[in-house]
Amino acid sequence: MTLQHTRRIVKSLFILFIIVVCIYLLPRVAINAFYYPDNKVYGPTPAEAESITFTAKDGTHLHGWFIPTAFGRPENAVATVIHVHGNAGNMSAHWPLVSWLPERNVNLFMFDYRGFGESEGTPSQEGLLNDTKSAIDYVRHRADVNPERLVLLGQSLGGNNVLAAVGHCVGCANMRYADQAGIRAIVLDSTFSSYSSIANQMIPGSGYLLDDRYSADRNIASVSPIPVLILHGTADHVIPWQDSEKLYALAREPKQKIFIPDGDHIDAFSGRYANLYRDAMINFIQTALSAK
């Protein structure tokens, strides 16, 4: 074997090595572009909040708040809402959007995914899904919560995690079967339909690098018969409202959609609309609870 031939073989092996590394790393780089965690404190801890540390299934320590109903004992609340936030900030940034819920006689549980706020770890698709499941399990086992009256509120990316946590991936080779016990209603606010679709909107072709098993469009049909409410602003500058139209078409009954004229991203429960969409959510929850 000549020296020149040896060099060609080494060069070919090196190129092959680079290709393998890229195939392995690029999907991880692409999905990490979805997450913008920080530990900045955007406001004081709510006075009524119980600060919680709970453990994900893989041992990661996660931080949450339990804010009881403003009316009487928590176990007698209309429901307990588990809030699953989006891909940026932490729960202190999202608190103003849901601070009204305890005044409607519901308990509220908020938590931060791994790597967000005071929670340990590093974000990943599977990690955030496991964190969401662990949060639901934690609330189910609280002595002061009625485990048969749970509501999931997923905002933006949180909607994908909610649906993946209580649904299973339709069309996937290895389907996940999730525990839907006690989940009486699901509310999705400004949720994108799939990781690949939103990635392709940002960088054409990048969606092929992502794992869509955790995407809303793969899981929404399988959460039936849990009622689903979908809200989205028609002027959302982050996620097109058409994503929610697609999700509504895929969802099974019972389902409801509300499109907010000129509404922006996760805008439904902001102060812009007073109680209009807050009332709609509470009415939806009460209807879902009365169905059984």
From Swiss-Prot:
Belongs to the serine esterase family. Gene3D superfamilies: alpha/beta hydrolase. Coiled coil: none annotated. Keywords: Membrane, Transmembrane, Transmembrane helix. It comes from the Bacteria. Its main location: membrane. It is found in: Membrane. It is a single-pass membrane protein. The lineage of its organism: Bacteria, Pseudomonadati, Pseudomonadota, Gammaproteobacteria, Enterobacterales. SUPFAM superfamilies: alpha/beta-Hydrolases (SSF53474). The chain crosses the membrane at residues 13-35. InterPro entries: AB_hydrolase_fold (IPR029058), Hydrolase_4 (IPR022742). This is Uncharacterized protein YfhR. GO terms for cellular component: membrane.
